[in-house]
Amino acid sequence: MNPQWKNFLLSEQAVIENDGRIVFAESQSDQPHIYPISDLAVLSVSGKDAAKLLQGQSTCNVFEVTETQARIGAFCNPKGRAIATFLLAKQADAYLLVLPQELLEPVKTRLQKYVLRSDVRFADRSNELCLLGLGWSETAVESLFAAHCVDGMVLISLGSTPYRTLVIAEPEQAENLWTDRLGQGYAPGNSEDWRLLDLLGGIPWLDQATSEEHVPQMLNLDKLGGISFTKGCYTGQEVVARTHYLGKAKRALFLAECALGTAPAANAAIRDRNGGEQSRGQVLTAISRDGICHLLAVLLVSESGEYDLVLKDHPDVSLRLLPLPIA
C-alpha cells in the first residue's frame, strides 16, 4: 500500500489489521459508502507490443479494451486452468491489470517469459496507485465493466445492486475523492465489506489455494464476457474452446449462504446431504458476517436443477443457493 495513502487512512480513523484489512467504525448500512481496497493490486503492462502479448495469454479480447471499456478475464496454464482472474483497463498507452495481491508476482513472472524480443514493460504499481470502491443503492445505470478516465483516475463499473464502481487513482486523487465523497454523505466502509460485495456480485477472484484449479467457464467468466471464442490462440485456449463447443460445462459457479459463523477455507469440500462422501464441488471463496456465511462455490451442475448440499466438514448445515447477478 502506498505510504501516503496509508497515512491518510489512519488520519481518517482507520484501523489497519495485521492481515491488511482496513476497518472503520460502524456506519448505517443504507448510506452510500467509499471503501479502501486492500487485497487487490495493479500491474501495469506497457510498450508497443503490450496488447499483442496480453492477447496471446488471456481469455478475453484485449483489443476490445479501451479507455471506455474494461474487461474481466483470466490467464490460464496449458491445461486451461485459470491461474488468476483480473480486471483489465486502459489508461493512455498502458494496460492496467487489477488482480489479487498474492497472485501479482506469479502472474508477472509468467508473463515475462513470453516477452522475448517484444517491446513490453511490466511494473508492479501497488505502491504507487490506490484502489477504492464506491457503492450506493441505485440500480446500475451503466453496462458491466464500462470504464471512464476522469481527472487521471480510472473508473470501472461493476454493476449489480448496490451499484458499484472500482477506482484506480494516485494518492492525492484518492485523498481528494475520499474527502469529496464524505462531504456528499458517503461513509467509510471496511475493506472486507468490499470483498463481500465482490463475492455477492459473482466476481470470481482467485488466491494461491484456488489458482490453477478451474477452467474459466467453471468461474462463469463466459457469462461475464471474460472469454472470447473468436479471438484466436492463447495459452490454454484449446481446453477452454473444447469445453465450450462440447456443450454446457459440467461445473459452474454458484452463490450460496449458510448459517455458519466461521468461513470455510478455499477448496473446502461440498457434498450431497444424503449422497455419502462423494464431492459435488468446493468452495472458491467465503466470508462470514453476523453468523451467516456467504460463499462462491464451483459445483457439479444438477440435470434436475435440484440441490441439497452441505459442507463436508459441517454436515448439519444446509447450503442455500442464491441467484447470481449474472448467470
Where are these regions (language model features)?
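Short, conserved active-site entrance elements at the starts or edges of catalytic domains
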Residues: 191, 197-222
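Acidic, proline/glycine-enriched N-terminal capping motif
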Residues: 1-72, 76-77, 81-83
